[in-house]
């Protein structure tokens, strides 16, 4: 079954972001999506972390992501408590705003030494927020055979609010979808996957 009408994509967290965005960009390839706590409403899921990451960089890594990366390479193992949040933000920047003049390096949405917002780069991030992408890609979303969204009401990154905001945009654009909010946080939600996969299978199977 090679056609897009029989191909769906699902993911959680950053993978949930991809599950929302890839079908918008490639409706020729995918005909349904399921997103579990996908990154959305960037001003809530990313922006609040910038000050604490700037502090961590200042206090532990000389205000430099390069120093963070060098220290990580030399560490005997990956210490999530020490490296995780800052490294994740660096990875997001590599994905959203890669530096065309420095392959493998990002353009950062804030000054790592002070935390001061770089408005130009931040606006480029916001342009990639699923909530803001919904309207310009409404036709692609409207072509989906199934759109399923869920998130925990106690998600630490406020991705329940992101899912709700994306859902509200879909409703405003008259795009059919399902949103389920449940009691839970960001982790420990893999039990939600089978139900979403079942919905995709039912929508993508041969009639």
Task: For the regions a language model picked out, list residue spans one by one.
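Non-catalytic cap/lid and distal C-terminal segments of serine-dependent acyl enzymes
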Residues: 1-207
């Amino acid at each position: 079954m090679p056609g897009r009408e029989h191909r769906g994509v699902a993911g959680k967290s950053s993978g949930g972001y991809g599950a929302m965005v890839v079908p918008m960009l490639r409706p020729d390839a995918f005909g349904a999506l399921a997103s579990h706590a996908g990154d959305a409403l960037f001003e809530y899921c990313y922006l609040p972390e910038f000050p604490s990451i700037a502090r961590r960089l200042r206090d532990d890594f000389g205000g430099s992501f390069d120093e963070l990366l060098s220290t990580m390479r030399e560490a005997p193992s990956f210490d999530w408590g020490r490296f995780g949040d800052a490294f994740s933000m660096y990875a997001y920047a590599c994905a959203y705003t890669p530096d065309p003049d420095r392959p493998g390096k990002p353009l950062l949405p804030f000054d790592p030494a002070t935390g001061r917002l770089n408005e130009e780069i931040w606006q480029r991030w916001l342009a990639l927020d699923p909530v803001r992408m919904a309207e310009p890609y409404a036709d692609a979303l409207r072509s989906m055979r199934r759109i399923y969204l869920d998130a925990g009401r106690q998600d630490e990154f406020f991705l329940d609010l992101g899912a709700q905001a994306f859902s509200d945009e879909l409703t405003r654009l008259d795009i059919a979808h399902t949103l389920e909010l449940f009691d839970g946080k960001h982790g420990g939600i893999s039990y939600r996957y089978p139900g979403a996969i079942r919905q995709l299978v039912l929508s993508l199977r041969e009639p």
